[in-house]
């Protein structure tokens, strides 16, 4: 999976001395807001909000990854989400769409539910063997999202 991007607009609020960032999705709608005393902190907060939102949507079987950009638009500042962020969201989405609980998925993989839950957390770094087993368990492609 290549990186995906969420461009954002930034505004400095003089009254509160904070940077306010508003993410814009691929349909140019607001997709997350964050504020902090520095752009870097606000960007990290926006990034965390976006990941939480994508995970929540995946829990409902909704694919919101398409709301992100495949390239950061020219002259834009963007939150960058990499494969280690996005692959767990894709795995969760596929599991939910197959109507499986984490426990049922773990059983198919021959691991504990706790070990499986780690695969669905952004930042996880599953090995190739694990990803192949996930693909087989879901009868769906996952590896194409890992590159």
Report residues per predicted region.
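N-terminal flexible/basic segments that precede or flank functional cores
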Residues: 2-86
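Recognition helix of helix-turn-helix/homeodomain-like DNA-binding domains
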Residues: 110-125
């Amino acid at each position: 999976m290549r990186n995906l991007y969420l461009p954002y607009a930034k505004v400095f609020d003089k009254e509160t001395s904070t940077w306010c960032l508003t993410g814009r999705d691929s349909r140019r709608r607001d997709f997350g807001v964050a504020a902090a005393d520095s752009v870097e902190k606000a960007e990290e907060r926006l990034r965390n909000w976006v990941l939480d939102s994508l995970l929540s949507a995946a829990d409902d079987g909704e694919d919101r990854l398409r709301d992100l950009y495949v390239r950061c638009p020219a002259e834009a500042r963007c939150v960058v989400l990499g494969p280690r962020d996005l692959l767990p969201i894709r795995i969760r989405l596929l599991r939910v769409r197959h109507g499986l609980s984490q426990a049922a998925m773990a059983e198919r993989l021959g691991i504990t539910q706790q070990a499986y839950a780690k695969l669905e957390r952004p930042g996880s770094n599953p090995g190739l063997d694990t990803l192949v087993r996930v693909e087989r368990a879901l009868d769906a492609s996952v590896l194409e999202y890992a590159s």
